[in-house]
Amino acid sequence: MYKIIEVKQSVFEDNNKDANKLREECKDKGVFLLNVMSSPGAGKTTTLSRTLEKLKDRMKIGIMEADIDSDVDAKTISEYGVRTIQLHTGGMCHLDADMTRQGLHEMGMEDLDLAVLENVGNLVCPAEFDTGSTKNVAILSVPEGDDKPLKYPLMFQVCDVVLINKMDVLPYLDFDVEKCKENILYRNPNAKIFEVCAKTGEGIDDWCNWLENEVKAWKE
C-alpha cells in the first residue's frame, strides 16, 4: 500500500498560500512589493538604479537583491542610500514567497512605501513562483530579440509590466519594436509596456510616474 503525491503541484499550492498571506501583510502595512524579473544582463540593476534616482526622495524604498552568489548588485544599489539586503538562493534559480517574506522581515518593512525584489536572472523559474508581489515586472532587452515573449510565454503572462530596455542599440540590431509589443500583448493583452534605456534615461520618467501612481493607489 502506498500513496502517490504530486510533488510539483503540492509545492505550488503551498507557495501560493504563502504568497497570498504575504500580499495581505503588505497591503495591511501599506508596502508595495515589486518583483523585477529578466534574463541575466537585461539591465535589472541599471534600471533599478535609474528608478532610485527618480523616486528615492519621494518615497521610502527598500531593495532585495537575489542572486545564487555574490553581492555585486547589492553593493551597487546600496550606494543610493536606500535600505538594501542581499539574498543568496543557495543554487536555486528563483525566489518563492517564503524566501521573499524572510527577506522583507530581515530588511525591515514597517516604514517602507516600496519594496523591490530583484529576482534571479532567469526567464523560466522566477515566473513559476508567486512571490507575494503587488506587481510583477519583466525587463526584455533589445539584444535578446523580439521573439522572447513567444519562446518564454509564462514570464510575460504573469507580468503586469514589460520594460523594453536598451533602446539605444536598436539601430544596430534586427529588432522590431512593434512586433515585440504585438508578441507581448499576444501573451498578455493587459500588459503595460514601456520603451526605456536605463543607460541614457530614455523613458524612465514615464515608468517611474506609473510606478509612483501604483504605489499611491495601493496605499489608499
Where are these regions (language model features)?
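Active-site glycine-centered loops adjacent to acidic/histidine catalytic or metal-binding residues
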Residues: 67, 165, 197
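Nucleotide-state-sensitive switch-loop elements of NTP-binding domains
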Residues: 2-37, 42, 46, 51-134, ...
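Conserved C-terminal guanine-recognition region of P-loop GTPase G domains, centered on the G4
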Residues: 126-133, 142-190
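Residues at alpha-helix caps and immediate loop-helix transition turns in enzyme cores, especially N-
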Residues: 47, 96, 148-151, 176, ...
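Short histidine/acidic/glycine/proline-rich micro-motifs that form metal-
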Residues: 12, 90-91, 168-170, 200
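Canonical P-loop GTPase G-domain recognition
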Residues: 169-220
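Residues at the C-termini of beta-strands that transition into short coil/loop
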Residues: 88, 140, 197
